[in-house]
């Protein structure tokens, strides 16, 4: 995979934005409103532009390889959980929020929240959080051969919460490497909402 180096000079940020648009638009953003997560399911408080921006920015923290993520998070003053230190891949969601806010000047707290929890979801999630979380799973890096995709799409035909709970149960039963506390809290919230 292409590694991006960002020095955050004005020119580098422009290049980064162009690469993000080229890399993510087709792969991820259109999926927010396809494959079952349809516009009709998004209430009037969430705009397509919020979902678009969150979808565009959600993985920018991935510019830092796993072996640099703890160091970068500490440098940026990002609080890390034990589970994130143990499995640095997860840190990219917090780095993405930081970069979106500090370097791309995103100020909408709803967008920043969705970026920050797109991998794990979290307790008291918003509808935008849930949509970006699901779009991220539908557009899984492994392509269409995601082992959970068919079941997730079936659950999505019921509602967003059912799809999210299906995915979380699937990865836990499949031997999740690290159980992030936010994921477990989101699971409880989903179970309560669906009971």
Curated annotation (Swiss-Prot):
Domain HD: from-to ranges: 24-141
UniProt name for this protein: Uncharacterized protein in pepC 5'region
Highest classification ranks of the organism: Bacteria, Bacillati, Bacillota, Bacilli, Lactobacillales
